[in-house]
Amino acid sequence: MLQYPQIDPVALRIGPLAIHWYGLMYLIGFALVYALGRRRITSGHTTSMTVRDLEDLIFYSVLGVVLGGRLGYVLFYKPAYYLANPLEIFYLWEGGMSFHGGLIGVIVVMLLFAHKKRLGFFTVSDFIAPLIPLGLAAGRLGNFINGELWGRPTDVPWAMVFPQSGDGLPRHPSQLYELGLEGIVLFALLWWYSSKPRAAGQVSAMFLMGYGAFRFLVEFTREPDNFLGLLAAGLSMGQWLSIPMVLAGAGLYLFTARPPSR
């Protein structure tokens, strides 16, 4: 068993201001997306997007992630609770975000952005898709530092006891699994795959399939939310939300891979 490195969730204090690691990781995540996107633009990888376009897209995507992530959590995970306590929807400092909701928020942002800039939707989504995984990796590192979203009990040699779980049981460090698979591995695959010209929509399709598949697998080691538990077929909410991602990605890939009709 490995020792869980208990880290103060507050990264920096400036007078009364406390900067938490989790918020800092969000900032680092968006900074990584910007740096990688800027590199691709300035290297001539794309001629459809400018650096100013990237800056605008990231700014609005922050809103999409926060609003979509919060509303997704409210609707997917605790609708009855927030229906009874609607004002708590705005208590963002108490946590409660959904990746799948954040993804929907970003998709809406990309649709509006593409329309405003008169670009094809897949021109935008194929450009941004390979940049997202490292941002996700930063977020999962924030989860690990906070000691939240821990895994299920296990006896594997690298199990850790997360103090916040309250039961003292060794558990999978599932946040690190997600960091590795949904973050680093998915980034490497998409960066390589998108380095060559692809049909419009195929890079986006690979992101949907890759993230959905990795998240589905990791959920087998992640402790289900205690207020939900496992759902139909013994699957978690995260798995049920990931299945449509994989199916949509596969359908999009097959559709865009068709030879043009004559």
UniProtKB/Swiss-Prot annotation:
It holds the Pfam family LGT. It is a multi-pass membrane protein. It comes from the Bacteria. InterPro entries: Lgt (IPR001640). A 1,2-diacyl-sn-glycero-3-phospho-(1'-sn-glycerol) binds at R140. Its main location: membrane. The chain crosses the membrane at residues 17-37, 57-77, 95-115, 119-139, 173-193, 200-220, 227-247. Pathway: Protein modification; lipoprotein biosynthesis (diacylglyceryl transfer). PROSITE patterns: LGT. One of its GO terms (cellular component) is plasma membrane. One of its GO terms (biological process) is lipoprotein biosynthetic process. Keywords: Cell inner membrane, Cell membrane, Membrane, Transferase, Transmembrane, Transmembrane helix. GO terms for molecular function: phosphatidylglycerol-prolipoprotein diacylglyceryl transferase activity. It is found in: Cell inner membrane. Its EC number is 2.5.1.145. It is an enzyme of class 2 (transferase). NCBIfam families: lgt. Catalyzes the transfer of the diacylglyceryl group from phosphatidylglycerol to the sulfhydryl group of the N-terminal cysteine of a prolipoprotein, the first step in the formation of mature lipoproteins. This is Phosphatidylglycerol--prolipoprotein diacylglyceryl transferase. It comes from Bordetella parapertussis (strain 12822 / ATCC BAA-587 / NCTC 13253).
